[in-house]
């Protein structure tokens, strides 16, 4: 099974609120449809969910955030998810929408529900889930990052490969010279943060990918602007990107 995260930075224009990169989405899914094994797709919020999260000062830590903000973030994520689903169906991927409320209780994953996602993937459908604003309990809520969903699903289902599709080639040891780290285990990068991204941007992705690799999972970062690299990673060909492994 292959677990794939479509980063918010590649599926939306993060500098322009509520704008999807529809051509990029179509190109990526046109490559993903060629994968001949069960898949699970996760996508980020980009300029949809993150835009409203910042506006309403919502974060990944459960707290008493404005419930109007929760509602607006959820609605915006449904809008973005619909764009992904429409592109998937157009590309003959049998997309099966699974909001995170289907497998989360508070901020903890429900193991048997995640095991069911695997069965759905094996049936010929492709589960599609996403980062979202979730009710935590009483008057508390929080932002669940798509990167955290990757770790949750990865640790329970143990996919053959987990791929983060980004708008850059991978992790750079130096962001100015764009020197690519091909094997993360051998080198540690300097990470610059993007102020708009409440779920942690590249820092969060690296943390989650490292956690996944410590569980024995193989994780790749690839550039979605060159979507054939996704297939190269899946097929085991030499590809441009960053690998995380134990």
Segments and roles (model prediction):
Residues 2-246:
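C-terminal catalytic "cap/lid" subdomain
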């Amino acid at each position: 099974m292959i677990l794939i995260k479509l980063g918010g930075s590649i599926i939306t224009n993060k500098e322009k609120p509520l704008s999807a990169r529809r051509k990029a989405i179509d190109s990526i899914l046109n490559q993903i449809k060629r994968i001949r094994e069960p898949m699970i797709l996760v996508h980020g919020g980009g300029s949809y969910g993150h835009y409203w999260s910042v506006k309403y000062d919502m974060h990944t830590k459960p707290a008493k955030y404005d419930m109007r903000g929760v509602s607006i973030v959820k609605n915006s994520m449904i809008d973005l998810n619909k764009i992904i689903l429409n592109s998937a169906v157009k590309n003959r991927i049998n997309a099966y929408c699974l909001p995170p409320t289907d497998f989360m209780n508070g901020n903890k994953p429900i193991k048997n529900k995640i095991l069911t996602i695997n069965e759905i993937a094996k049936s010929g459908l492709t589960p599609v889930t996403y980062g979202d604003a979730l009710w935590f309990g009483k008057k508390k809520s929080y932002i669940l990052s798509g990167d955290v969903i990757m770790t949750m699903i990865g640790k329970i289902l143990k996919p053959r490969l987990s791929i983060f599709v980004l708008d850059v080639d991978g992790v750079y040891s130096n962001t100015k010279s764009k020197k690519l780290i091909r094997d993360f285990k051998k080198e540690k990068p300097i990470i610059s943060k993007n102020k708009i991204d409440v779920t942690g941007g590249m820092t969060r992705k690296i943390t989650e990918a490292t956690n996944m690799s410590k569980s024995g999972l193989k994780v790749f970062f690839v550039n979605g602007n060159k979507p054939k690299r996704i297939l190269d990673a899946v097929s085991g060909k030499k590809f441009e990107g960053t690998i995380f492994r134990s």
